[in-house]
Amino acid sequence: MKDMYLLGDEGIDAWNYTKDSNNSIAGVSDTDEFRSLMEAFQIMGFSPDEQISILRVIAAVLHIGNIHVVPERRGSEDARLMNPNQAEKLCHVLGIPLDGFVKGLLKPRVRAGREWVNQSRTAEQVKHSLDALAKGLYERGFGRLVEMVNNKLDTKGDGDSFIGVLDIAGFEIFEVYLSNIVADPIAHDLPKLLVQQL
């Protein structure tokens, strides 16, 4: 399976998105956990194609994180891939043409008035685009996984069986939103109350 997604045997420290994380839990075997995951896919009735698509997204995110972008040359702001091999791996995993991906990444076509032109991008802009792509792929892939699990659980079609996911960052934003709803009327009415007290 590692060969299929061009992951190699380097381990978790070989991937920029995971190498700085606390990736070891005492008493937990990653190999055993992966076997359990694959067994759970089987039990839930995930087809081989569904399993492949889930794992493909994870592999793609890892490969995106390892694409390094640098200025084309000294004094130039135009970006280039430091090692095109990593982009080749990503494109292979996703089944997309390398040339189109690289052009779209480094010099995307944008509309300028009535014409289309290729816009040069800086290394920072390209890195931002890569991170956004990884985040978008992961978010959609995870959302699709939850949807697939819910479809497998909801055998009666009544929506009684499902899993829900709490997005902590989103929940914190929701908490701030609720605080603002409560605070806004108070902030609006407080000056009136103070004037009445005087």
Please tell me what each predicted stretch does.
Residues 1-198:
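N-terminal switch/interaction subdomains of large nucleotide-dependent motors and GTPases
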